[in-house]
Design a protein with these regions (language model features):
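Helix-start/capping segments and mature chain N-termini
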Residues: 1-117, 138, 145-354
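Extended, Lys/Arg-enriched charged tracts that mediate electrostatic binding to polyanionic substrates
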Residues: 126-136, 140
C-alpha cells in the first residue's frame, strides 16, 4: 500500500529538551489509516498533526473499542536513530486487537509507516541524555452509530512525542501504594491487552495514591486480592534472598516487552529468575525479615524504576534503605545502553532507522 505524504507548511518550534516531561509535546506529523469491512485497510497517509473530526456516536466514545501501544526512538551519540524491538509492539497491538475484535494491522506495513513518519520528523528526536521520542500507535472503532455491535469501521493512527523521564523522580526510587480494594483486571478479561479501559478503571486508586504522595499503585489479583500483579504503568520484579521474582503472566497482566527483555538479560547472565505467583504475604514477610533486597518496575515509558517504598494496610515499608539496588542499576544501565547505542546489541533487538 502506498503511503501518501502531506508535509506541514507551518513547522512548530521545538521544545526545550531540558524540560520535556512526558507526553506534553507532539511532532509536526502523524500517520493515519482507515478501515472498512468492505475495503479493508486503505488510505494510508502522513499528514500535519491536527485534531480529529469524529461522529458523536463514534464507537470508541461509547463502548471502549480502543487499543494502543507505546515504544520509543532513541538518538545515539553518533546522531543515528534507532528503535527497540518494535516488531514486538506491533505483535502485541494485534493481540490486543484480536481480544477487542478490532481489525488486525499488517505488522510489517505498520513498521514501514512508523519508519517513514520518523524520517519525516527526525529532527524531533531529542539529543539530550535520557530523552527519547515516544511513539504512540493506537487503533479504535469508528462506526457512526450507537449500539453494541461488530465493528465495521476503524482508524489506526501513530503520533510522536519527544519525552524526558516518565516519573519526576527519574532513576531515583519511587513510592508505591498497594491497592487493597479496587482491582485492575481478572483472568478472562482484558488485563493482558493495552486497552484504554484498563487504565481508566485504575484512575480512582491512582488518584488516591497520588493524593497520599505515592507515584503509582501496585495491583493485587482480582479474585483473592492476594497475589502481586503489576504497577499501573509497569511490570514489577523483586529480589528476595537472591531470587529475582516477577509475577507469572496469567492473562490478567500485560506481557511487557521491557519485562521480557530484562528476563532474557538476567537469564543470559545466569541469575536465579522465577516467573511465579507472588503473594502479598510473602512480600511483606520478606520485607520484615530483611530478605527483600530490591524491587523495581519496568516498562517502555519508565524503562527501569527502582521501588524505594511500599505502603500496605496502613504501614510503610522501605526497600534497600530507599536507595537504588545494584541489580536495578545494572539492568537500567544495560537496557538503556543498548537502547541508546552505548552497548553493543548482541540479541538483534535494535532496529535502526536508515
Amino acid at each position: 500500500m502506498e503511503i501518501k505524504i502531506e508535509k506541514t507548511l507551518t513547522p512548530k518550534a521545538k521544545p526545550d529538551e531540558s524540560s520535556l516531561g512526558f507526553g506534553q509535546y507532539f511532532t509536526d506529523h502523524m500517520f493515519i489509516m482507515d478501515y472498512t469491512r468492505e475495503k479493508g485497510w486503505h488510505d494510508a497517509r502522513i499528514v500535519p498533526f491536527s485534531n480529529l473530526s469524529l461522529h458523536p456516536a463514534c464507537t470508541v466514545f461509547h463502548y471502549g473499542a480502543e487499543i494502543f501501544e507505546g515504544m520509543k526512538a532513541y538518538r545515539t551519540a553518533e546522531g543515528n536513530i534507532q528503535l527497540f524491538r518494535p516488531e514486538q509492539n506491533f505483535a502485541r497491538l494485534n493481540s490486543s486487537a484480536e481480544r477487542m475484535r478490532l481489525p488486525l494491522v499488517d505488522e510489517a506495513f505498520a513498521l514501514e509507516a512508523l519508519e517513514t513518519l520518523i524520517k519525516i520528523d527526525a529532527d524531533w528526536v531529542p539529543h539530550a541524555p535520557g530523552t527519547s521520542l515516544y511513539i504512540r500507535p493506537f487503533l479504535f472503532g469508528a462506526d457512526p452509530k450507537l449500539g453494541v455491535h461488530s465493528i465495521d469501521r476503524s482508524v489506526f493512527i501513530i503520533i510522536l512525542s519527544p519525552v524526558g523521564s516518565y516519573y519526576k523522580e527519574g532513576i531515583n526510587p519511587v513510592k508505591i501504594m498497594i491497592e487493597t480494594e479496587d482491582v485492575r483486571a481478572v483472568k478472562g478479561g482484558t488485563g493482558y491487552t493495552k486497552c484504554g479501559g484498563n487504565y481508566g478503571a485504575s484512575n480512582r486508586a491512582g488518584e488516591k495514591a497520588e493524593q497520599a504522595g505515592y507515584s503509582q499503585v501496585l495491583w493485587l489479583d482480582g479474585v483473592e486480592r492476594k497475589y502481586i500483579e503489576e504497577v499501573g504503568a509497569m511490570n514489577v520484579m523483586f529480589k528476595i534472598n537472591g531470587e529475582i521474582v516477577t509475577p507469572a503472566l496469567t492473562g490478567s497482566i500485560l506481557p511487557g516487552i521491557t519485562r521480557k527483555s530484562i528476563l532474557q538479560i538476567l537469564r543470559d547472565e545466569g541469575a536465579n529468575v522465577s516467573e511465579r505467583l507472588l503473594s502479598i504475604d510473602e512480600l511483606i514477610e520478606a520485607l520484615e525479615a530483611g530478605t527483600l533486597e530490591e524491587g523495581w518496575g519496568c516498562g517502555t515509558a519508565a524503562v527501569v524504576s527502582p521501588i524505594g517504598q511500599l505502603y500496605y494496610n496502613g504501614k510503610t515499608y522501605t526497600i534497600n534503605n530507599g536507595k537504588i539496588g545494584d541489580t536495578t542499576q545494572k539492568l537500567y544501565d544495560t537496557l538503556t545502553g543498548i537502547q541508546w547505542g552505548k552497548i553493543e546489541d548482541t540479541r538483534g533487538w535494535v532496529h535502526p532507522i536508515k
